[in-house]
Regions:
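Short boundary/hinge segments that flank catalytic cores
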Residues: 11-129, 133-154, 158, 162-166, ...
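Polar/charged helix-initiation
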Residues: 1-2
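Active-site-proximal beta-strand/loop segments in catalytic clefts of secreted hydrolases
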Residues: 183
């Protein structure tokens, strides 16, 4: 029988202890597709970068944090996005603009961004109507305390309501920001959105 060489075993264990975690970290970095910086975002997509909103862990996701006269960094971030949207519009339409806030995943901050960007625009004396097109959950309507009003987008798209002005409600405490709720949740949301009445 041959006794194990303790120095050789210790060196192999040390190398394995260094190499295996390093290999694991390298593989995870290759498989990680998330974006962490503005530079990574600009390199990954060919669209204009409007701004970034800091993560506010102590704020409730559905709170409107943009307030008149506030100098908080999150309020300033929304004002920068608002101003950049305005600068992108070189034609300066007088009719109106549409801004779509969307994402591939639920709970990614769409409601928070929509409400605060809308409030930022309203504070700049822009008439704002937020349209809740989530015909499956109506989360935007719920978050501002309006709830599921009997008349909303689904009622208009199904032809039960003809005058859009009947659907507009004041959003929260500020009368400059308005919302059209999703309305009663329909059994066929995809078909309603394709109905052509949204054009």
């Amino acid at each position: 029988p041959v006794a194990p060489k303790k120095v050789q075993v210790a060196l192999i264990a040390l190398l394995a202890g260094i190499m295996l975690p390093a290999l694991w970290i390298y593989i995870r970095s290759l498989l990680n597709t998330s974006v962490h910086t503005k530079k990574e975002l600009k390199a990954g997509v060919n669209i204009p970068f409007l701004g970034e909103v800091p993560l506010e862990k102590n704020k409730h996701e559905k709170d409107i944090v943009v307030q008149e006269g506030s100098r908080e960094s999150i309020c300033e971030a929304f004002k920068i996005v608002r101003d950049n949207l305005d600068f992108m519009d070189t034609e300066k339409k007088t009719v109106g603009k549409v801004v779509l806030v969307t994402s591939a995943n639920p709970d990614s901050g769409k409601t928070f961004i929509t409400l605060n960007l809308g409030m930022s625009m309203a504070l700049a004396n822009v008439k704002v109507v937020i349209l809740d097109l989530d015909l499956r959950k109506g989360s935007l309507s719920k978050s501002v305390g309006i709830g599921m009003k009997k008349t909303g987008v689904s009622n208009y798209l199904s032809g039960k309501v003809d005058d859009v002005k009947e659907l507009v409600q004041v959003c929260g405490d500020d009368n400059r920001l308005h919302i059209i709720t999703s309305g009663a949740l329909p059994p066929n949301p995809a078909e309603l959105l394709k109905s052509g009445r949204l054009d």
